[in-house]
């Protein structure tokens, strides 16, 4: 059959991957075994933004050195499940850092701030008068652009990433006229 473009993206915002990542990594390895084109994406640029999916507070800003050190730890841990000799490793700074302001605005036009603001943790932060940075609202669009840039057929991620992965589907459909799919693992 057709070889699919598949990816799993992880922002290196902590020193260790969590147990829930093992499920997604095992699924990725299964797809490697089936001969698909698999990318392990390191969200070094999106790690600078901070994902609101599971956070009540803004994430602390990491240095590029901290992000790189975390990536090394992630790869070492993930290699116990994923055969990296058959996987492409990419860093999303390769394309996100090249987007112009105009490019970013055009991407943002595909999304509604209302959809972002309706997410449970964002609603709670707003109700509690806690700061929600505008940069955080751009996070789903940037993760979605990862999917678009990699021309993915399937994106794998945890349940906490469903909203962000849907952004990739939106961009694939709106900008490429292509249906893409997500596999949601249960963490």
Summary of predicted features, one role per range:
Residues 24-27, 70, 74:
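A general structural detector for well-ordered alpha-helical segments in enzyme core domains, enriched
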Residues 39, 45-46, 71-86, 91-187:
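Alpha-helical recognition segments enriched in aromatics with Gly/Pro capping
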Residues 24, 57-59, 107:
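A glycine- and small-aliphatic-rich helix-loop capping segment at beta-alpha/alpha-beta transitions
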Residues 13, 58, 92-95:
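Residues marking the start of alpha-helices
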Residues 52-68:
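A charged helix-plus-loop insertion that forms the helical arch/lid used to bind
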Residues 2-52, 155-162, 168-169:
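N-terminal catalytic cores of NTP/NDP-binding nucleotidyl/phosphoryl-transfer enzymes
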